[in-house]
UniProtKB/Swiss-Prot annotation:
The keyword Cell wall biogenesis/degradation does not apply. Belongs to the eukaryotic ribosomal protein eS25 family. The lineage of its organism: Eukaryota, Viridiplantae, Streptophyta, Embryophyta, Tracheophyta. This is Small ribosomal subunit protein eS25. It holds the Pfam family Ribosomal_S25. Residues 1-33 are annotated as: Disordered. Residues 20-30 have a biased composition (Basic residues).
Length: 114
């Protein structure tokens, strides 16, 4: 009697697995930033609020005004120009992309006390 041939598994196109069986990794859903709905034009209430409160802030930048008053970035830059012209804030440091301002104090500079 001829010896029985063991059935060999049919050849597959997949390479042989090594190691234990692992779950397939799932893609995580990317986090999406919430869209902000900022004002593009000033209304009277927002402009009056800006004039009264922005001069009291320690640090004034376009980003802080945009976040606090919910206004557009370009509108915040125009508001800063208006506040500087009124003397409510003064420039501390400027860079090509960021200008930093602070509240104006009504101190008189003594030229002889240097």
């Amino acid at each position: 009697m001829a010896p029985k041939k063991d059935k060999a598994p049919p050849p597959s196109s997949k390479p042989a697995k090594s190691g234990g069986k692992q779950k397939k990794k799932k893609w995580s859903k990317g986090k999406q930033k919430e869209k902000v709905n900022n004002l593009v034009l000033f209304d009277n209430a927002t402009f009056d609020k800006l004039l009264s409160e922005a001069g009291k802030q320690k640090v004034v930048t376009a980003a802080t005004l945009s976040e606090r008053f919910r206004i557009n970035g370009s509108l915040a830059r125009r508001a800063i120009r208006e506040l500087v012209s009124r003397g409510a804030i003064k420039m501390v440091c400027h860079h090509s992309s960021l200008q930093i301002y602070t509240r104006s104090t009504n101190e008189k500079v003594n030229p002889t006390a240097a």
